[in-house]
């Protein structure tokens, strides 16, 4: 029962009817990705930058709540700098059928990567994960080539994150999902960056700091006063993001 409650806390999807119409302030394309072998079907949004030759793609994995209507709005942070943007909803989120599971999220990440690789070389794919999405992003980066990996408000593992948040006797019961980000990071052979705020009440700064040895001092960016949901409201975030994207 406790693990079932933990799972409901970890995964907080908002479902959408099949006929829901997405609306954004820039051009986009909606489509579904389907894996015939497993039957997994996930909803995706693609935002083209609309200019420049040899464009690159930001393959974005969002956090644990909401759906594409919320997360698609972040596309402008990247398209304004000439980067195409692809974001997916995990199983059970938005229009994606099914229930969210750890393996289902990893499988979804692979499906999105397959779509990207048909249109971009791996050197032009940037994997980006935010919060829970840092697990999917780091898992994918540990298994597939890309230009670089960027994580925003990541955690070392779900087990460790729970230990930071609840009494020890509850944490010792374990987590219903693992999402071992620190384990995946050690296996990523290309550049990795982390953005973390000092006032994050969901992923404590100390928790994210555990990932620093696998990223390096020069790519671990601390946003003073930044929380869990507002890093893109800080000029320092945008300044460093542009630098990282252009490296």
Label each residue range with its predicted role.
Residues 1-34:
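An N-terminal hydrophobic leader/cap segment in hydrolases
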Residues 37-115:
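Membrane-embedded segments
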Residues 115-118, 122-166:
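Primarily recognizes the serine-hydrolase "nucleophile elbow" in alpha/beta-hydrolase
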Residues 154-184, 190:
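Mobile cap/lid helix-loop segments that gate and shape the active-site cleft of serine hydrolases
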Residues 187-189, 194-196, 200:
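Short beta-strand/loop motif that positions the catalytic acidic residue
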Residues 201-207:
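Conserved alpha/beta-hydrolase "acid-adjacent" motif
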Residues 226-236:
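Catalytic histidine-centered segment of alpha/beta-hydrolase-like enzymes
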Residues 235-247:
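Catalytic active-site module of serine/aspartate enzymes centered on a nucleophile-bearing elbow/loop
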